[in-house]
Amino acid sequence: MLPLGGATRKLLNMTTPALLTVPDREALKALYDDAIKQINPSRSAIDLTTGFYAETGNAVFDAGYLALSDYCKGSAGPRRLHVVSAPAGGGKTSYSYALMLAFTRYADQKPDAPYGCVFVVDQIKKADEAFKDLNALIPGKVAVWTVEHDRVCKKRTKVPQPAAEFTKDELRHYPIIIVTHAFYNGPTGNKAHIVVRDKRVYSGRALTVVDERPEEVVIHELTLKQAQDIREKLEEKRPDLKQVLDKLMLLMMPYTVNVSGGIVRASDQFGQEFVTDQLEWFTTMEAEGVLRDHRADIAALDQLFGFARAMTLGCAFAAPSGTVVQFVGWQSKLMVRPGTILLDATADLDGVSHICPWRQHVSIPQAHYGNLKIVHVPQHTRQRLSEYLKKAANQRAYVKWMVETIKEHMAPGERGLVVCKKALFDAERIPQWTDGDPRFKDPESYTGRYEWDIEGRKLCATHYGTGIGSNAWKDADVVFLFDEFFLPRWIAAATVQGLREQKANEGALALMKTVNSKAEAVDLIGEGHRLRWTKQMALRGRGRSYDQHGICGKQRLVISSELKSFMANVARLFPRANIRTAGVYTKTTRVALLIEILTNPDLPSKLTSKEISKLIEAKTGKRTPWRTVSSNVLTEEFGRALDAIGWRYVTGKGRGGSHFERTQQIIIQAA
């Protein structure tokens, strides 16, 4: 069993139930079906009992039953996570409610059955909503705890009027509890596992339902300059800590002049035993107290202390990024224990399942995105945005381009969601109000109430890094994704190590000489992160609703990203969506140029290689025989991109034998 924020050590002192009887599948399924019928009237827009939704319901039940079977095997139970990656808006949460209701009622009837459920959510607001829903269905048997649902909480910002108040210790008396990821994986997370049944205290709840992918690996990242700034501020407040901070700095300093440009580890030079001995203080309760007392007034103090703790475990490295050396550490916080299911719409895309055998997917129904109209537009700049957006002039230019794009692809009277980089929020560039506008003091107005107005267009805005799982914008007619959310490669590498519970001198990282060295697992996590955020945020609007055949609601998606990569993956992200390009692509690759050409809806259904050459010449002004292009573009990735826009390439013998022809899978929409 994995340690969960220290919870496992505390659970050893609790009573562990003897091997329990696996619930009778048919009896549990009957209770599950009854619970769905109880919930269904409150879901007026959909019918949970038929078609596409019913298939999702079967998937949730299958995952839940497998999880309970694992739990009943005790310590011999498989260490795995059963995953339901049904589409966003497909009813996963409603069915998880039905599962917890059915299981609780079954346990009430069967004294030898496993007992207790915990619903783990990513947001405080979501916890409050879940409590309202579940408590209405099974009154008196549900409890919730977040920092804002605590009885002694004095400052509430997420839920000013919580649906209920509890203490952590009261959770054990309720068969169903709702907590956040942060609490479940935190230092007192053991309280989520304790449950009282028939006046006896047990050490584990049988069923854990995790809503949305949790933070399975905590990353601690900083530069030497940041570390030195933090050290100076902390020494001003605590001069007695100079010696322990000096030890940390001495272990970091040698790697700031990384001549080789490679990955380095303090343990390789000094030995892990020496590093652990030098930094032992950072693992003490005293260090935790210092962090608690000063984290609010010293930015990134938790990053420095976290990196130091990671070094004591051999879970840290340094690597250059341009002219700056990045120091990276990690801590595994995997929610992998018998009896657990994960509800996450993009768990099939995020790369984790490809590198971690403990994820087990159940069969799910496939959504149809025929009502999703995608418009791909050129990027404002091909420079790295983390650097480009540091300058105020560039921020203004970027936002001006955003506004022009919104006006071009959205009609007055429509509602839209804008997703962009957090830097634009931090600088108060989004919305494009004047500096110091008092409306910035009410973020809910432009993040939730559509009070950002562009000539009659009603908009909300959010940034990458937040918003996954939110229903706040489900009435948006159009979603704008301005660029993508990339994971720095050094963080992707650390994430792989954390997911596999490996140290810096083990696994993929041990074989990498630099952060850019070839590593399939790192590639999968990096690409998976980007695809996950693209799909999750793209479907925050009307597209997240489905009919009984699994066809999504009518929505437009306007996306600015690297064209070749997007087209190569769009069929995986949004099967059967309607796609076109708009705008002028400059300095584009030949693959992207071909994609741009072939998205013209006025083209005939068949194009010979000679005709394609003429179209390329018309675009570029240069004579370009197909034979000089084909050897570079006819790749598997290009084939996926062709399929996504409704074309395929057919090889043939002789001049004019090879050609492009339309398929019937995708309908290219006219501009």
Regions found by a protein language model. Name each.
Residues P3-A671:
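ASCE RecA-like P-loop NTPase motor cores
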